């Protein structure tokens, strides 16, 4: 049986996306030394997600870490090498998180790190920046 939950938040980068969730309890960075530019594999040894791929996933994390170089890394992964995530959900989206030109949502009516689990199917509907967005979470029991 599936469980479905809908959360409302604010679109920080517009678009629609869906994919399997990858949830990091730790702050997350997009530099080439954190997520490989050509494979999308996480190479942050201190992160429990080390070795997993962000490709085609909805990545959920508290907020970004690292320098503004991460914005170039995220853009490259999403738009050039095509190994980036399809969307981002954060407690607090930083300007770095919108550089990938993929949907990014924060300001949710619940804590995304508590509501979304790795493996859940997540759909983002973020049609206009600064306006309400919805996140639909589907969990198979």
What residue ranges belong to the model's regions?
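Feature captures the catalytic cores and cofactor-binding loops of soluble hydro-lyases/lyases
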Residues: 2-17, 21-134
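Secondary-structure transition/turn motif
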Residues: 136-141
């Amino acid at each position: 049986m599936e469980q479905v939950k809908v959360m409302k938040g604010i679109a920080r980068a517009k678009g629609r996306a869906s994919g399997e969730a990858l949830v990091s309890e730790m702050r997350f960075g997009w530099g080439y030394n954190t997520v490989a530019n050509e494979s999308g594999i996480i190479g942050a040894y201190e992160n429990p997600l080390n070795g997993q791929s962000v490709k085609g996933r909805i990545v959920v994390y508290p907020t970004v870490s690292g320098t503004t170089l991460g914005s170039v890394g995220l853009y490259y992964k999403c738009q050039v090498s095509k190994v980036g995530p399809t969307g981002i959900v954060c407690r607090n989206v930083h300007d770095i998180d919108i550089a990938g030109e993929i949907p990014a949502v924060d300001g949710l009516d619940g804590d995304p790190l508590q509501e979304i689990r790795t493996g859940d199917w997540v759909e983002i509907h973020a049609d206009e920046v600064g306006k309400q967005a919805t996140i639909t979470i589907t969990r198979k029991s």
